[in-house]
Amino acid sequence: MASLKEVKTRINSVQSTRKITSAMKMVASAKLHKAQGAIENMLPYQRKLNKILTNFLSADLPVESPFCVERPVMRVAIVAFSSNSSLCGAFNANVLKMFLQTVGEYRELGQDNILIYPVGKKIEEAVKKLGFFPQGSYQKLADKPSYDEAAALAKLLMELFLEKNIDRVELIYHHFKSMGVQELLRERYLPIDLSAVQNDEERGGVVNDYIIEPSAAQLIADLIPQVLSQKIFTAALDSNASEHAARTLAMQIATDNANELIQELTKQYNKTRQQAITNELLDIVGGSMA
């Protein structure tokens, strides 16, 4: 059985850890509140913008967009969103798992034909360990999502796609649903996927009774870059909110575990102390009777 001093030292150590996890939970919770507000304000706009574009591209209009062209996939770009720091449960591990699965599906293309755009320090480090060369560093976008930085990344991807330097772009990120639920998604970014248009229940029907000026072609040409830039920005906001939610939950669990451990150690301390007092009394009684 451990001595009183050892048990007391361990109690103090766990109490110190509990203070840290509790403080981290409060910080993460405050950041989550801010990030949640940002994503909840942005998602309706992004979805509506995307629906308007989908309606135009699926309508019987004599317009074709180069961003919708399907071609054999010879070169692919993968944009994966993670966090810059750890202590957020399985958040980063799940991103890495899906990333490895995605890379495995394109392995036959060769490593040189798989371009990785890591958004976040953790996925960037993992990409380097796997032997890939990251196409830039986007740690700032993961920590503090900025529309300008997201738009710059979107512009780069669009240019590469138009120049046929890449044939497909995929996104891997967490979609924030609630503090307890963050859904990991893998979506095709380019070419634009119009398959959702085939499902009436999901899209609620195509509305194409728009008055278009100056022309549908010009409107679509202006709208697509905005939609694609907005998609990257929304994914960054989604991932950021999911990260803070995962960290808040992880720190809450850690704090609860610390409380339980402190209770167990306190019981052990009291039991050990009581045993020591009993032994001392027995020694005193035994000595007086000798």
Swiss-Prot record:
InterPro entries according to UniProt: ATP_synth_F1_ATPase_gsu, ATP_synth_F1_gsu
Molecular function GO labels: ATP binding; proton-transporting ATP synthase activity, rotational mechanism
Cell location: Cell inner membrane
GO cellular component: plasma membrane; proton-transporting ATP synthase complex
Subunit structure: F-type ATPases have 2 components, CF(1) - the catalytic core - and CF(0) - the membrane proton channel. CF(1) has five subunits: alpha(3), beta(3), gamma(1), delta(1), epsilon(1). CF(0) has three main subunits: a, b and c.
Function, in words: Produces ATP from ADP in the presence of a proton gradient across the membrane. The gamma chain is believed to be important in regulating ATPase activity and the flow of protons through the CF(0) complex.
Annotated protein name in UniProt: ATP synthase gamma chain
